[in-house]
């Protein structure tokens, strides 16, 4: 497993991460540092979904979700909020793109507003990459 730290620019709700070649691998979100999210009245609207367009859409992950992160009601902070995975969920990327497109939105599909309000901002995140293993034959275990 390879861990890569990124400092990226969030434009609106989209992050683009350039890659040196098309990614035929598994990917997982390890941690993310984001500015304060403007809170809403209910808990549902204070969760964010982090999706990746290059993740394979499957029966159990049709929305290409990397992670859903609930923040609950939060108090204003001057600095970044940090979220770290206790368990890394790996998802298959099978794309000819030489980039990853990651989107951050509220679980209710509304735009996540950060404080202070500005169009572009820096985020820090760590992604885990693993090679896709060739499936073993069931005869290997006999």
Report each predicted region and the residues it spans.
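Flexible assembly/topogenesis modules
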Residues: 1-142
């Amino acid at each position: 497993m390879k861990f890569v730290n990124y400092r990226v620019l969030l434009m609106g709700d989209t992050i683009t991460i350039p890659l040196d070649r098309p990614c035929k691998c598994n990917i997982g979100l390890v941690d993310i540092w984001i500015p304060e999210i403007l809170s809403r009245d209910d808990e549902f609207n204070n969760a964010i979904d982090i999706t990746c367009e290059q993740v394979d859409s499957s029966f159990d992950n049709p929305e290409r979700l990397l992670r859903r992160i609930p923040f609950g009601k939060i108090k204003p902070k001057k600095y970044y909020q940090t979220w770290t995975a206790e368990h890394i969920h790996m998802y298959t990327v099978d794309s000819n793109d030489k980039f990853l497109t990651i989107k951050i939105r509220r679980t209710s599909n509304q735009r996540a507003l950060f404080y202070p309000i500005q169009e572009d901002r820096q985020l820090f995140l760590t992604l885990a990459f693993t090679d896709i293993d060739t499936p073993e034959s069931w005869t290997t275990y006999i």
